[in-house]
Amino acid sequence: MAETYNGIKKTVGKALSAKKVWYFLQSVDAPIGSPALLPAYQTEGGVTYGGENVDEQTKMGRIIIKSTDEQAIDLTQYFVPGDESIEVVKDAKKTGKSVKVWRVIVDESVAEDVTDAEYKLYPAEFGYGMPDEPEISDGDELVEASYTLNIIGSLQDGKFPLTDEDIAAIEALYDYQNPGETTGDYSDIQTTPPAQ
């Protein structure tokens, strides 16, 4: 057998910060044209690319063949009253319906510009997930919600559109303001005077 040298390939770059991976949800009953929901105060997220293999011994040796996909997305967040995403998950668990879920890498190094569009495209995975044991934990600190979305079939690769304004709004709780421009706490900023 002839010796062949094909070299090596090395990836160089900055490691991806977990803060640049965002998860979005949507009810399967949401009308066409509805926005995706960003679960409030996500603290952790993760994807499991599991599955089963058929593993058999034969007279000719071992055979291993892929059998099933068992993918899941786990999310943990702090509970905020009025957060629609938690209601979507709880309702889906009650009704037996799935939830649409996107895992999006929101990093400028992987963004794709779109000609004549105000948004960029970011690498994403999409799937329909069945909620498994949504849990709301009322401890001594902040109320925490966690749940697993077991993916039906397997996650599909695609591109998720986001504008710079979307990203800025998600990354910051509020924008810069001058004195007297607004009233209200950071969670209830008002730009018009209250009616008297």
Model region roles, listed by residue range:
Residues A2-T76, Y128-V143:
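Solvent-exposed edge beta-strands and adjacent loop segments
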Residues G13-L16, T115, P193:
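N-terminal cationic amphipathic segment used for targeting or macromolecule association
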Residues Y41-Q42, V106-D157:
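Short beta-strand and beta-hairpin "edge-sheet" elements
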Residues T58-P123:
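Structured, beta-strand-rich domain cores
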Residues E84, Q156-K159:
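Intrinsically disordered, low-complexity acidic/polar segments
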Residues V88-K90, V143, F160-D164:
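Surface-exposed beta-strand edges and their flanking turn/coil or helix-capping segments
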Residues V99-R103, G153-D157, L173-Y176:
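Glycine-rich loops and low-complexity Gly/Arg-rich segments
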Residues P161-Q196:
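Intrinsically disordered, low-complexity terminal/linker regions enriched in Pro/Ser/Gly
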